[in-house]
Amino acid sequence: MSDTVTTARATARFVRVTPMKARRVIDTIRGKSVEDALAILKYAPQAASEPVAKVVASAAANAENNFGLDPQTLVVSEAYADEGPTMRRFRPRAQGRAFHVRKRTSHITVVVESQKGSAQ
């Protein structure tokens, strides 16, 4: 078994986007090459695509700078959005009522790995 590292990871915590909306974006890039994933995210209409793109770019930079991996061969092997803490707020309504507003946060994690043969 060789000691060469072929994976790198990046995490963005407490991102102000709901996990469900982040997962919708993440599902489109899982298994794609990093270049393809960034191109998809650049033109995706969802608001969650911007923080996900930053995490993908950070994971690719970690792979290149920390482990010396070739950025051309990187593939998004794992990507997931876990639920972070929920901020609870009140929305004033008529006649003294108050509705609850839940401002959800996400922890977005992306793992990239080097495919030695060819990028997808």
Curated annotation (Swiss-Prot):
tRNA processing as a keyword of this entry, yes or no, is: no
Give Gene Ontology CC terms: cytosolic large ribosomal subunit
Single GO MF descriptor:
rRNA binding
SUPFAM superfamilies named among the record's database cross-references: Ribosomal protein L22
Under the heading NCBIfam families, the entry gives: rplV_bact
Q: What job does this protein perform?
A: This protein binds specifically to 23S rRNA; its binding is stimulated by other ribosomal proteins, e.g. L4, L17, and L20. It is important during the early stages of 50S assembly. It makes multiple contacts with different domains of the 23S rRNA in the assembled 50S subunit and ribosome.
Q: Subunit composition?
A: Part of the 50S ribosomal subunit.
Q: What is the name listed in the Swiss-Prot or TrEMBL entry for this protein?
A: Large ribosomal subunit protein uL22
